[in-house]
């Protein structure tokens, strides 16, 4: 196992260690979240964790959790989530995130917003000083509106292109049946909170991948002297 995967596994385990019996859990999407789901399943099977139920943020996560025997509920059937654990594509020092590399950010944001505590689990490569310099900001749009939204985003200073599928002809289609515009700002994102609101106010936009004022804790996997460890970051 390479160092990056070791970091992901360590940080996923650290997050699972915070889970208590009887919790309703938000189970995130992506490679690190998948490791967290696997670690949770092991603890449930051993009896170390009991009476928990998960709410997944993607079809991928639902399939994995079901296969591993984790009890699940739909998002619409819960009014509150005790603890949500998810990864991120970028994290800045203020715990503001870009998510949506897996095109699941709408459900991910809904789950994070319902959570009493939202923990983000990442390896050290996801830490940045400024968002959007390296990773594009996903914006989920109605299929009939993507051209109009694309033009409006230009007025905000962003260049957005449809995310194309890798193993089928045409664009990526989300779990909600929508399209994704991946957005780049030449100098990165200066004011994430303002931009999140501006983008979501565009007609035809369902949600964007900026997560602002949602994250309670960031657990990061790090390597020092070839030893893998986990650090809980402090918000600036």
Swiss-Prot record:
Q: Which residues bind substrate?
A: 29-32, 86-89, 99-102, 126
Positions annotated as active site in the UniProt record = 108
Known pathway: Carbohydrate degradation; pentose phosphate pathway; D-ribose 5-phosphate from D-ribulose 5-phosphate (non-oxidative stage): step 1/1
- Record's GO cellular component terms: cytosol
The highest taxon in the source lineage is: Bacteria
Q: Which reaction does it catalyse?
A: aldehydo-D-ribose 5-phosphate = D-ribulose 5-phosphate
Q: Where is the signal peptide?
A: none
Per the UniProt entry, the Enzyme Commission number(s) are 5.3.1.6
The record's section on InterPro entries has: NagB/RpiA_transferase-like (IPR037171), Ribose5P_isomerase_typA_subgr (IPR020672), Ribose5P_isomerase_type_A (IPR004788)
Which class of enzymes does this protein belong to?
isomerase
Provide one Gene Ontology biological process annotation.
D-ribose metabolic process
One GO term in the molecular function aspect is: ribose-5-phosphate isomerase activity
Family note: Belongs to the ribose 5-phosphate isomerase family.
The protein's name in its UniProt record: Ribose-5-phosphate isomerase A
User: What organism is listed for this UniProt entry?
Assistant: Prochlorococcus marinus (strain NATL2A)
Starting at the broadest rank, the lineage of the source organism is: Bacteria, Bacillati, Cyanobacteriota, Cyanophyceae, Synechococcales
